[in-house]
Amino acid sequence: MLELALEAERNAIRRYKRRAAQADALDEVALKVQIEDLIVDETRHAEEMERILTDWKT
């Protein structure tokens, strides 16, 4: 189950990065910053899940 959640986080990060690039191309600075904040949050979630999975498997 955690593996699926981790994959979902990684997919979200990829999508947000794409959206941030689109916002940048449209000079939507505020939107880009908001999306970058989401990327930070999702990255933290993914890293936490990776740690949990690593600790659980050892």
Put a short name on every predicted segment.
Residues M1-T58:
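Iron-associated oxidoreductase/ferritin-like identity signal
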